[in-house]
Every structure is written in C-alpha cells, then in structure tokens.
Amino acid sequence: MGVFNYEAETPSVIPAARLFKAFILDGDKLLPKVAPEAVSSVENIEGNGGPGTIKKITFPEGSPFKYVKERVDEVDRVNFKYSFSVIEGGAVGDALEKVCNEIKIVAAPDGGSILKISNKFHTKGDHEINAEQIKIEKEKAVGLLKAVESYLLAHSDAYN
C-alpha cells in the first residue's frame, strides 16, 4: 500500500466563519441546492453529523461514479477544520483503499478566506495516483466552493 499526498489552496471572498457554516456545517443541504449537476443528495446513514458519522453522497446520472460513502473524522468549529474519509464508492475499490481529506478554512488579510485542502490517497498494492485524477478532484472541489460562494454573494443574509 502507498500513500500519495496532495495539498491545494483556493482563495474565497467569503469570510472564514461564514464559509465554514455554509460549505461544511450545512453543506449536506446546500450543495444539492447550489450544485445539482455535481451532487444529487447527501444523507446521513449513521450518526449525528459529528465524528463517526457515515454519509452517502449520491451523484447525478451521467457522473463517473454513482455514489460515495464518507466517514466524518473531525469537525472543529473553532478552527474551521473538517476531516473526512471516503470509505466506499467512487474511486475506492480495486486501486484505492480510502481517501482521507482535511479541509481548513483560514482568514485572509483582505477579509475573505483561504480554503486549504489536504488529500491522502491510500492505494492498494502498487497502484499509483496519476496527476490527471488529482486535477479532476481539485476542479470538482473548487467548483463546489465557487457554487457556495456565488450563493452566499447572492444571499447576503444567509449563514451570518
């Protein structure tokens, strides 16, 4: 088994606390609303949203994958940090054992924020992660962030 790390940062004009509330704490409801082309539904299969919770994210028809199951590993409301692992579905299977993700939202000097993402791909056997796979996953994450950002800009009273 190998572990391949990937880190990225994406700026946002939305303040960290507001972005964390919308994107992380209420993302299960908000993402299918603002990005239905990317997320059809999110349901809690087990747990209350805190560590140990298992969520099933279903993707729209025509997506490369039907669904993923994620386990919530950490929700830090003070430091705006969220960690979760993809444990089933999606790319997890023959080549990947799991994908561990950490999202941290930090304040930016301009009043906005910076979304810091860390991914650890745990491969099976001697499988490797190629750069194209990582690029696709980053583009998806940025797309979701921008959809939430657009919603928040259009709804200035939401998630304050």
From Swiss-Prot:
Lineage: Eukaryota, Viridiplantae, Streptophyta, Embryophyta, Tracheophyta
BP GO annotations: abscisic acid-activated signaling pathway; defense response
Region forming the signal peptide: none
Protein name: Major pollen allergen Aln g 1
Similarity comment text for this entry: Belongs to the BetVI family.
GO molecular function: abscisic acid binding; protein phosphatase inhibitor activity; signaling receptor activity
The keyword Heme appears for this protein: no
Keyword Cytoplasm attached: no
Organism for this UniProt entry: Alnus glutinosa
One Gene Ontology CC term in the entry: nucleus
